[in-house]
């Protein structure tokens, strides 16, 4: 192994790599890129709460917009409210419920909802073709015999103890 006592010096000449290949690839990339198109009409959702609307438990017209048919508070995703607005709406709804401006549940719509869900659950079901294998039938009949024999023995014991 060769080791020199002299320190390593970098060469003064710089390495020039041809930049031509890089430029070519950049040009082909630009060809495929589509220009950015600005939409013709700016699309912006209007907020459900206007600047003049006051979030208060007495403002029933505003509060009713944020309650579902069953009387539940709608989520932020559905309401499109900010976190602060949602918090204020929730507090206002809860205050209105406590002060009995609002019902805790909307029973009329809830009954309709329950009736629909029950009809979906208990609707006509296809009957299952129950086939019990013969071994299981035999086992069940033997078990029934054993149970009846056991009850007869118990009855006989009770009768003999009474005498």
Swiss-Prot record:
Q: Does the keyword Repeat apply?
A: yes
Where the protein is mainly located, per its record?
plastid
Family (UniProt): Belongs to the bacterial ribosomal protein bS18 family.
Organism field:
Oryza sativa subsp. indica
This protein's assembly is summarised as: Part of the 30S ribosomal subunit.
Renumbered to this chain, the Basic residues biased-composition regions fall at 7-48
Cellular location(s): Plastid, Chloroplast
Report the protein name in the record. Small ribosomal subunit protein bS18c
Family annotation (InterPro entries): Ribosomal_bS18, Ribosomal_bS18_CS, Ribosomal_bS18_sf
Q: Where are the sequence repeats?
A: 4-10, 11-17, 18-24, 25-31, 32-38, 39-45
Q: What is this protein's gene name?
A: rps18
